[in-house]
Swiss-Prot record:
It comes from the Eukaryota. Its main location: mitochondrion. This is NADH-ubiquinone oxidoreductase chain 1. It catalyses: a ubiquinone + NADH + 5 H(+)(in) = a ubiquinol + NAD(+) + 4 H(+)(out). The chain crosses the membrane at residues 2-22, 76-96, 102-122, 146-166, 171-191, 217-237, 253-273, 294-314. Core subunit of the mitochondrial membrane respiratory chain NADH dehydrogenase (Complex I) which catalyzes electron transfer from NADH through the respiratory chain, using ubiquinone as an electron acceptor. Essential for the catalytic activity and assembly of complex I. It comes from Lemur catta. The keyword Ion transport does not apply. PANTHER family: NADH DEHYDROGENASE SUBUNIT 1, NADH-UBIQUINONE OXIDOREDUCTASE CHAIN 1.
Amino acid sequence: MFMINLFLLIIPILLAMAFLTLAERKILGYMQLRKGPNVVGPHGMIQPFADAMKLFIKEPLRPLTSSSSLYTIAPTLALTIALVTWIPLPLPYPLINMNMGLLFILATSSLAVYSILWSGWASNSKYALIGALRAVAQTISYEFTLAIILLSLLLMNGSFTLSTLITTQEYLWLIIPSWPLAMMWFISTLAETNRAPFDLTEGESELVSGFNVEYAAGPFALFFMAEYTNIIMMNALTTTLFLGALYNLHMPETYTTSFAIKTLLLTILFLWVRASYPRFRYDQLMHLLWKNFLPLTLALCMWYVSLPVLASCIPPQA
């Protein structure tokens, strides 16, 4: 039964990821006053499957100087970690109801750095290595703010379990009392998933293609799939944390519908940001975190810690 549930979780995620690639090309196309893919199938709807077929039937080339084992493992590890991160998410019921679901997500998203680092180092290319080192520095840096923002939300939630966030937000979304955290969280998720304007790891002008420059065919497709799966996962987590969906015990499908719509809107916002903003310079990227986000998130975390203590000093009102 567990394996059936696992496949029922993985298959829709992969389908959503496939159509996200199409949605991105369509949205970018319309924002640049062109059509986007419109040949393969009605309105280009079968384009993702054509792309997948083309990539997976090509011969996967491997550089002679590369480290074969790590070079081969890295793409598979990237996609596996991206899919494993979905396990504790309530949709409205998680695959495994973990007591420390948020810590699990934070830990698995940290592991994604290893696949990028291994791919950059094992490729034995200076462009790939620089891209990988950039990705590691960027991801580790922005995980500081993500962790502190999560800690602040947990103080309001009172539990590490994601399912309790549904109950916490029954009457009020957490985005309303903590909108500065929500803004910093959204920008940090852009950096965490290496998306524009923080896609320094794939800087075409200086690094050709970044950490995956030596990859082709199937292994390249696995990295591509991992990136887009992470985007949907981060937006799903944002919805769970800040935009708690309506939950009815007798009609759980209302939660799923509301959850899917909010996640879709956040994902479109990701694509809109990519179409609108130029890439940050690397020093600006680091200054944004260490000089702006980190002090702000620490101050807000202290505020949320001290608020219950201050409130307890107020005498009861008649």
